[in-house]
Design a protein with these regions (language model features):
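Minor-groove-contacting beta-hairpin "wing" of winged helix-turn-helix DNA-binding domains
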Residues: 64-72
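A short, conserved structural fragment
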Residues: 53-63
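Short alpha-helical segments that sit at the start of domains
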Residues: 1-16
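Amphipathic alpha-helical dimerization/coiled-coil segments
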Residues: 82-98
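Short, charged/polar, Gly/Pro-enriched secondary-structure boundary elements
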Residues: 74-80
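Short, locally clustered residues in the helix-turn-helix/winged-helix DNA-binding domain
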Residues: 15-22, 82
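A short alpha-helical element within helix-turn-helix/winged-helix DNA-binding domains
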Residues: 27-37
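Short amphipathic alpha-helical interaction segments
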Residues: 8, 39-54
Length: 98
Protein backbone atom coordinates (compact mmCIF):
# COMPACT_ATOMS: atom_id res chain seq x y z
CA UNK A 1 0.00 0.00 0.00
CA UNK A 2 1.37 3.42 -0.96
CA UNK A 3 0.20 6.99 -0.48
CA UNK A 4 -1.04 7.11 -4.10
CA UNK A 5 -3.83 4.80 -2.98
CA UNK A 6 -5.16 7.68 -0.88
CA UNK A 7 -4.63 10.73 -3.08
CA UNK A 8 -7.32 11.79 -5.47
CA UNK A 9 -7.48 13.40 -8.89
CA UNK A 10 -7.47 16.90 -7.40
CA UNK A 11 -4.09 16.30 -5.82
CA UNK A 12 -2.73 14.90 -9.08
CA UNK A 13 -3.85 18.10 -10.83
CA UNK A 14 -2.47 20.37 -8.11
CA UNK A 15 0.86 18.50 -8.11
CA UNK A 16 1.04 18.86 -11.89
CA UNK A 17 0.48 22.61 -11.58
CA UNK A 18 3.21 22.72 -8.95
CA UNK A 19 5.58 21.06 -11.42
CA UNK A 20 4.59 23.50 -14.17
CA UNK A 21 4.96 26.74 -12.19
CA UNK A 22 7.89 29.05 -12.78
CA UNK A 23 10.03 30.64 -10.06
CA UNK A 24 7.34 33.30 -9.54
CA UNK A 25 4.65 30.61 -9.12
CA UNK A 26 3.07 31.55 -12.45
CA UNK A 27 1.36 28.72 -14.29
CA UNK A 28 1.36 29.40 -18.01
CA UNK A 29 -0.10 26.00 -18.92
CA UNK A 30 -3.71 26.18 -20.09
CA UNK A 31 -6.50 24.03 -18.71
CA UNK A 32 -6.68 22.25 -22.07
CA UNK A 33 -2.97 21.42 -21.89
CA UNK A 34 -3.36 20.10 -18.34
CA UNK A 35 -6.33 17.97 -19.43
CA UNK A 36 -4.34 16.53 -22.35
CA UNK A 37 -1.23 15.88 -20.29
CA UNK A 38 -3.10 14.17 -17.45
CA UNK A 39 -5.63 12.48 -19.75
CA UNK A 40 -8.54 13.99 -17.86
CA UNK A 41 -11.61 15.76 -19.16
CA UNK A 42 -11.67 19.52 -19.54
CA UNK A 43 -14.67 19.56 -17.19
CA UNK A 44 -12.68 17.76 -14.47
CA UNK A 45 -9.82 20.23 -14.83
CA UNK A 46 -12.14 23.23 -14.79
CA UNK A 47 -13.89 22.00 -11.63
CA UNK A 48 -10.53 21.43 -9.95
CA UNK A 49 -9.29 24.91 -10.89
CA UNK A 50 -12.49 26.45 -9.49
CA UNK A 51 -12.08 24.47 -6.26
CA UNK A 52 -8.42 25.48 -5.99
CA UNK A 53 -9.28 29.17 -6.41
CA UNK A 54 -12.10 28.87 -3.88
CA UNK A 55 -9.79 27.21 -1.32
CA UNK A 56 -6.88 29.58 -1.86
CA UNK A 57 -4.50 27.19 -3.66
CA UNK A 58 -4.65 29.11 -6.95
CA UNK A 59 -5.11 32.77 -7.70
CA UNK A 60 -6.30 34.12 -11.04
CA UNK A 61 -3.99 36.55 -12.82
CA UNK A 62 -6.20 39.60 -13.34
CA UNK A 63 -3.98 40.93 -16.13
CA UNK A 64 -3.82 37.75 -18.24
CA UNK A 65 -6.97 35.76 -19.00
CA UNK A 66 -6.55 32.08 -18.26
CA UNK A 67 -3.32 32.50 -16.30
CA UNK A 68 -3.03 31.49 -12.67
CA UNK A 69 -0.59 31.71 -9.79
CA UNK A 70 -0.01 28.83 -7.42
CA UNK A 71 -0.31 30.38 -3.96
CA UNK A 72 2.03 29.72 -1.06
CA UNK A 73 -0.73 27.59 0.45
CA UNK A 74 -0.99 25.54 -2.75
CA UNK A 75 2.78 25.00 -2.78
CA UNK A 76 2.79 24.01 0.88
CA UNK A 77 -0.01 21.47 0.40
CA UNK A 78 1.86 19.74 -2.45
CA UNK A 79 5.18 19.78 -0.61
CA UNK A 80 3.65 18.41 2.61
CA UNK A 81 1.77 15.61 0.84
CA UNK A 82 4.90 14.67 -1.10
CA UNK A 83 6.89 14.56 2.15
CA UNK A 84 4.20 12.45 3.76
CA UNK A 85 4.22 10.16 0.72
CA UNK A 86 7.94 9.51 1.11
CA UNK A 87 7.51 8.78 4.82
CA UNK A 88 4.57 6.43 4.28
CA UNK A 89 6.41 4.59 1.52
CA UNK A 90 9.46 4.17 3.76
CA UNK A 91 7.27 2.76 6.54
CA UNK A 92 5.58 0.48 4.05
CA UNK A 93 8.93 -0.83 2.86
CA UNK A 94 10.06 -1.45 6.44
CA UNK A 95 6.92 -3.41 7.20
CA UNK A 96 7.42 -5.55 4.09
CA UNK A 97 10.97 -6.40 5.17
CA UNK A 98 9.87 -7.69 8.59
Amino acid sequence: MVINDFTNTNFVILAHLYNEKNNENVIKTTQDEVADKLQLSRVTINKAFSLFVQNGYLQRDLKHVGRYYLTDLGCTVVENIRTLSVEVNMLSQKSLIK
